[in-house]
Amino acid sequence: MNLQQLFTMQKELDDFIEQTQNIQQDVFQEKGLALLVELAELANETRCFKFWSTKGPSAREVILEEYVDSIHFILSLGLLKGYTSIEIWPFV
């Protein structure tokens, strides 16, 4: 799967959510916050920051779900900023 496919799929999901939830306002900041929350959830499930703990990470499936949730919001934020191809991203 390439980046263009991911952007296309995310656009379809975003459009569906906006239509079914009647979202008409700019939600960039909310999506930014949602990304931070998902990254925090990912860190919590991997326990990568819990140097004091002896408990291991969550199951791979749980970690993967949080990772994918983060990717969703990265793509969604990119779409709001007009990024649909890695060639036009400013850091490339």
Task: Kindly give the residue locations of the regions a language model identified.
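Flexible "arm" and connector segments at domain edges
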Residues: 1-92
